[in-house]
Design a protein with these regions (language model features):
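Conserved class I S-adenosyl-L-methionine
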Residues: 145, 172-189
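A short acidic, Gly/Pro-enriched loop at the edge of an enzyme's catalytic core
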Residues: 122-131, 136
Length: 236
């Protein structure tokens, strides 16, 4: 794969591929991915997210950087009337999601962009997404890389545009530097409202927010994840 974003120097992710894939995952990249894949949108292109799915869906949710796919597959399996779209440039993560999708039988309400999420966000209509997730994103800890963090001045307006009024934006991280960064930028953004009323609101997930493998590893290593929920304020 090549970088789809016009300026590859501004990419928000690291490597494209890690360890060699097992045979089944390699086969799923060849057989299942073509059925679920969203082609990288071209500049100026518009995509109706509801039209991506073979059956009508009541809502469309978006996960940016779905990792190995556990959260996304869970949401698809537990919300069969919702179309779940995910963007992930790391091919091993895409292969992991495909295995879960095949095992759960949720091909009809999952669609995948195996690439940078930003061209997709730019192609979506206003108020077309009912919920968005950015969970355990790369913290880019070095100061010179902070502008690569997905949640920030460049992408919050993108999310605000595509999210419906009252839609939820869910963020999570075990890196306190990134948590502070996300809070600082999202709380200051005029289109988002933080829903927390006390510490328990950001220390615990709700029942419809499943744990991920990364989260479990973080807890085992002694790190405490933080869970943030924001609402897209009504327009006008």
């Amino acid at each position: 794969m090549t970088d789809s974003f016009p300026d590859a120097s501004k990419r928000l992710y690291g490597r494209r591929k890690g360890r060699p894939l097992r045979k089944r995952k390699t086969e799923l990249l060849d057989t299942l991915l073509p059925a679920l894949e969203i082609p990288v949108p071209q500049p100026g292109e518009r995509i109706d997210p509801h039209a991506l799915f073979p059956k009508p869906v009541r809502d469309v949710w978006l996960e940016v950087g779905f990792g190995s796919g556990h959260h996304m597959a869970w949401q698809a399996a537990n919300n069969p009337d919702v179309g779940v779209v995910g963007a992930e440039p790391f091919i091993n993560g895409v292969a992991g999601l495909l295995k879960l999708v095949a095992d759960e039988g949720v091909q009809d309400n999952v669609r995948v962009l195996p690439d940078d999420a930003r061209p997709l966000l730019d192609a979506l209509p206003d108020q077309s997404i009912g919920r968005a997730f950015v969970l355990f994103a790369d913290p880019w800890p070095k100061k010179r890389h902070w502008e690569r963090r997905f949640i920030g001045p460049a992408n919050l307006p993108r999310l605000a545009r595509v999210l419906k009024d009252g839609a939820e934006l869910r963020l999570a991280s075990d890196d306190m530097g990134l948590v502070r960064w996300m809070l600082e930028h999202t709380v200051r953004h005029p289109d988002f409202e933080w829903t927390a009323r006390g510490p328990s609101d950001w220390r615990h997930r709700s029942e419809d927010w499943p744990p991920t493998r990364y989260e479990e590893k973080a807890i085992e290593a002694g790190r405490k994840p933080v869970f943030l929920r924001f609402i897209r304020k009504p327009r006008g």
